[in-house]
C-alpha cells in the first residue's frame, strides 16, 4: 500500500532520524551560509562564491597550501552555542590562543583547522567593530579581541631579533582602527551576549 517507503527499515533512516532529532540550532551571530546549513542541512544556491564572501574565501583556500586538507573530514554543520563554548574551553585548557596577537592570517588558520577537523563552516568567528574591545558575534565563543597596551607593544618590539612581519610589529595594519589586538578568554561571554546588546542591527536576520 505505501510501497517501499512503508518499510520502517529503510537503510540508514533510524540513524539519520536520530541525528535530526539531536541536531542543535546554529548559534546566534553565525553567517548566512551557516544559517543555510541549519535551515536546509546544506549550503543552498543563495550562498555561492559569487554572492558570499565566506564561501569565496573558503574556495580560495583550496588553491593554497595551508598544511592540511581544506575539505572537512566530518559532516559540514553550523557552529552551535554548545560547540562554541566547548571549543573556547578546549583552547583555554590546551593553551596557545590566550594573549596571542591577532592577525587575519592567524584567524584564517584557526578557522580552517576547526572546519577541517570539526566540520563547522568558517563564518562564525566575527567580531564587533572597533575601536576598543571587539566582542564575538557568535554567542558561546568566549574569546574577545582586546587592544594591546602600548607598554607591552614597546617591550615586544625591543631587541634585534624582532621579525618585521610578526603581527606585533605590524602595528595593527590588519585592523581598520590600526589597533594591535590579542585574543583574550572571558568566561562571561558564555552567558552574556555583549555583541547583541551593543549592535542589535547585526542580528536582524538571525
From Swiss-Prot:
Note: HIV-1 lineages are divided in three main groups, M (for Major), O (for Outlier), and N (for New, or Non-M, Non-O). The vast majority of strains found worldwide belong to the group M. Group O seems to be endemic to and largely confined to Cameroon and neighboring countries in West Central Africa, where these viruses represent a small minority of HIV-1 strains. The group N is represented by a limited number of isolates from Cameroonian persons. The group M is further subdivided in 9 clades or subtypes (A to D, F to H, J and K).
GO CC terms, sorted: extracellular region; host cell Golgi membrane; host cell plasma membrane; membrane; virion component
Motif position, PxxP: 72-75
Entry's localization field: Host cell membrane; Virion; Secreted; Host Golgi apparatus membrane
Reported induction: Expressed early in the viral replication cycle.
Positions of region (Binding to ATP6V1H): 148-180
Keyword Secreted: yes
Motif Dileucine internalization motif per record, residues: 164-165
Domain-level remarks: The N-terminal domain is composed of the N-myristoyl glycine and of a cluster of positively charged amino acids. It is required for inner plasma membrane targeting of Nef and virion incorporation, and thereby for infectivity. This domain is also involved in binding to TP53.
Start and end residues of each stretch annotated as Mediates dimerization, Nef-PTE1 interaction: 108-124
Modified residues (Phosphoserine): 6
Short sequence motif named Diacidic, residue ranges: 174-175
Its membrane topology: Lipid-anchor
Protein name per its UniProtKB record: Protein Nef
Region (Acidic): 62-65
Database matches in Gene3D superfamilies: HIV 1 nef anchor domain, Nef Regulatory Factor
Biological process per Gene Ontology, one example term: regulation of calcium-mediated signaling
Family: Belongs to the lentivirus primate group Nef protein family.
Region feature SH3-binding, mapped onto this chain: 69-78
UniProt-listed InterPro entries: HIV-1_Nef_anchor_sf, HIV-1_Nef_core_sf, HIV_Nef
Provenance organism: Human immunodeficiency virus type 1 group M subtype B (isolate LW123)
This protein's UniProt keywords: AIDS, Apoptosis, Early protein, Host cell membrane, Host Golgi apparatus, Host membrane, Host-virus interaction, Inhibition of host adaptive immune response by virus, Inhibition of host autophagy by virus, Inhibition of host MHC class I molecule presentation by virus, Inhibition of host MHC class II molecule presentation by virus, Lipoprotein, Membrane, Myristate, Phosphoprotein, Secreted, SH3-binding, Viral immunoevasion, Virion, Virulence
One MF term in the entry's GO annotations: protein kinase binding
Pfam family, one: F-protein
N-myristoyl glycine-type lipidated residues: 2
Gene from which this protein is expressed: nef
Site (Might play a role in AP-1 recruitment to the Nef-MHC-I complex): 20
Coiled coil: none
Amino acid at each position: 500500500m505505501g510501497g517501499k517507503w512503508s518499510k520502517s527499515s529503510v537503510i540508514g533512516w533510524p540513524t539519520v532520524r536520530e541525528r535530526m532529532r539531536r541536531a542543535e540550532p546554529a548559534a546566534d551571530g553565525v553567517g548566512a551560509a551557516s544559517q543555510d546549513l541549519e535551515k536546509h542541512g546544506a549550503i543552498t544556491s543563495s550562498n555561492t562564491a559569487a554572492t558570499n564572501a565566506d564561501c569565496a574565501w573558503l574556495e580560495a583556500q583550496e588553491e593554497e597550501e595551508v598544511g592540511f586538507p581544506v575539505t572537512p573530514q566530518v559532516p559540514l554543520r553550523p557552529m552551535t552555542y554548545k560547540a562554541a563554548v566547548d571549543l573556547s574551553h578546549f583552547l583555554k585548557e590546551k593553551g596557545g590562543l590566550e594573549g596571542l596577537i591577532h592577525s587575519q592570517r592567524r584567524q584564517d588558520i584557526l578557522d580552517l583547522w576547526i572546519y577541517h577537523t570539526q566540520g563547522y563552516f568558517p563564518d562564525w568567528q566575527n567580531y564587533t567593530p572597533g575601536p576598543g574591545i571587539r566582542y564575538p558575534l557568535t554567542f558561546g565563543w568566549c574569546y574577545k579581541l582586546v587592544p594591546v597596551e602600548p607598554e607591552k607593544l614597546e617591550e615586544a618590539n625591543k631587541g634585534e631579533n624582532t621579525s618585521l612581519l610578526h603581527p606585533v610589529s605590524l602595528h595593527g595594519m590588519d585592523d581598520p582602527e590600526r589597533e594591535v589586538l590579542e585574543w583574550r578568554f572571558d568566561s562571561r561571554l558564555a552567558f552574556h551576549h555583549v555583541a547583541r546588546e551593543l549592535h542589535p542591527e547585526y542580528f536582524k536576520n538571525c
